[in-house]
């Protein structure tokens, strides 16, 4: 069973590391091509392209300019400990044991606009480049065209190494569009999280994002290997809702948040 999630805009390169173990991203040559395009952009062009404030555009222009290989523990940080958005609040990798990190390294991947696909312990340098960004590049007008089949090929390699054919999609629509479903050698299970509000179950973005992280944490900490075991997920009051689930779209609901 392979899990995929989105990255986060918010980063944390300051807090103490929960592990000293690390690995290297597998697609850095591709990342370098994107960096070569990004460093040509002025802060104002970055602000327009990424819809950022002048301050954030300046910060990210500096990040692109400072990006350099090789990655070391002095100039980079493990991906799973670098992202700090709602999904990662639910995941809470800072509290992982060595066994949790080991399981995650095999069974958990992070989709990325710049790095393509990251293992949890892959070192990364700070960046902002969302998958939906319309960055012109040598392969097209956006990052979906740039990555093409590359991300899917990497996922297929990982699935083959796991000798498994199930992928749990905990990523956003924007990021999962980078995966070519027809080329993926896996059944895709997509969990959805809904909260009771105004007399009906609804997807509430903040809660749904955190729940994706909670589910990843549940799978990792319990070392789940069978997809049916996911239906036992019960963190934060969520429960599998068989009546609302259909085929490979699994719905988890809760009445109180």
Swiss-Prot record:
Entry GO terms, CC: cytosol
One annotated GO biological process: response to hydroperoxide
Lineage: superkingdom: Bacteria
Family: Belongs to the UPF0246 family.
Name of the protein this chain belongs to: UPF0246 protein CPS_4102
């Amino acid at each position: 069973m392979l899990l995929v999630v989105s990255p986060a805009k918010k980063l944390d390169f300051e807090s103490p590391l929960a592990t000293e173990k690390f690995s290297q991203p597998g697609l850095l040559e591709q990342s370098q091509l994107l960096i070569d395009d990004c460093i040509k952009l002025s802060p104002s062009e970055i602000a327009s392209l990424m819809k950022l404030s002048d301050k954030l555009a300046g910060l990210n222009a500096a990040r692109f300019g400072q990006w350099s290989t090789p990655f070391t523990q002095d100039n980079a940080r493990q991906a799973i400990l670098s992202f700090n958005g709602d999904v990662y609040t639910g995941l809470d990798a800072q509290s992982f044991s060595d066994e949790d990190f080991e399981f995650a390294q095999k069974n958990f991947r992070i989709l990325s606009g710049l790095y393509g696909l990251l293992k949890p312990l892959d070192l990364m340098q700070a960046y902002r480049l969302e998958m939906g960004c319309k960055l012109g590049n040598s392969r097209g007008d956006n990052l979906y065209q740039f990555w093409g089949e590359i991300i899917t090929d990497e996922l297929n390699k990982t699935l083959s190494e796991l000798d498994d054919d199930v992928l749990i999609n905990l990523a956003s629509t924007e990021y999962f569009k980078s995966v070519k479903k027809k080329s993926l050698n896996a059944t895709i299970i997509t969990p959805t999280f809904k909260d009771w509000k105004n007399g009906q179950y609804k997807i509430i973005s903040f809660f749904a994002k955190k729940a994706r992280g909670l589910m990843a944490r549940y799978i990792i900490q319990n070392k789940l290997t069978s997809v049916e075991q996911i239906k036992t997920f019960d963190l934060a009051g969520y429960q599998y809702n068989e009546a609302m689930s259909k085929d490979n779209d699994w719905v988890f609901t809760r009445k109180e948040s």
